[in-house]
């Protein structure tokens, strides 16, 4: 694979355009793409939907309440889902920054017994930068959704790469 693709400090329109280009260029397309809709990410999400990917783009807000009540918030739940997937064999291309960010995360228990991930500010203090890569990977586990089911005709239409002349086969 290509590893991680990222863009630093781009405006929302450029980021949305770059995402849409990468999605359309991909031979195997993801069923879903979660967008961090806190702050400027909301504009990227809106534009990606306007560009026709509203069936793929899903809004994600890590400050929301967790689906599972054992977690303090959705951010904690996302990172737990990621850790669980890694234990089950989930693989990402090796990336030194991602490894550093993931290893910097710690957790504690709240007085009412909920699992709480350390704050983003604590991570920034520990590693000297924002944990952008680990947040992006964890965001893919915002919700555990089933794979999309495709009809055979939809699959062929989606993945057809060129027009084959009549009689070529």
Question: Could you tell me what each predicted segment is?
Answer:
Residues 1-116, 158-169:
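Mg2+-dependent endonuclease catalytic cores in nucleic-acid-processing enzymes, primarily RNase H-like
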Residues 96-157:
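Charge-patterned, long linear interaction tracts outside catalytic cores
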């Amino acid at each position: 694979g290509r590893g991680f693709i990222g863009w630093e400090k781009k405006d929302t329109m450029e980021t949305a355009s770059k995402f849409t280009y990468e999605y359309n260029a991909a031979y195997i397309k993801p069923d879903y793409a979660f967008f961090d809709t806190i702050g400027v990410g909301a504009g990227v999400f809106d534009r990606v939907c306007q560009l026709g990917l509203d069936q793929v783009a899903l809004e994600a807000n890590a400050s929301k309440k967790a689906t599972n009540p054992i977690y303090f918030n959705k951010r904690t739940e996302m990172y737990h889902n990621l850790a669980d997937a890694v234990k089950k064999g989930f693989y990402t291309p090796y990336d030194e920054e991602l490894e550093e960010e993931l290893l910097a995360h710690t957790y504690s228990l709240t007085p009412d017994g909920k699992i709480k991930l350390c704050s983003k500010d604590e991570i920034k203090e520990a590693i000297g930068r924002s944990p952008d890569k680990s947040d992006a990977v964890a965001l893919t586990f915002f919700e555990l959704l089933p794979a999309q089911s495709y009809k055979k005709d939809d699959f062929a239409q989606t993945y057809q790469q060129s027009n084959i002349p009549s009689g070529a086969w």
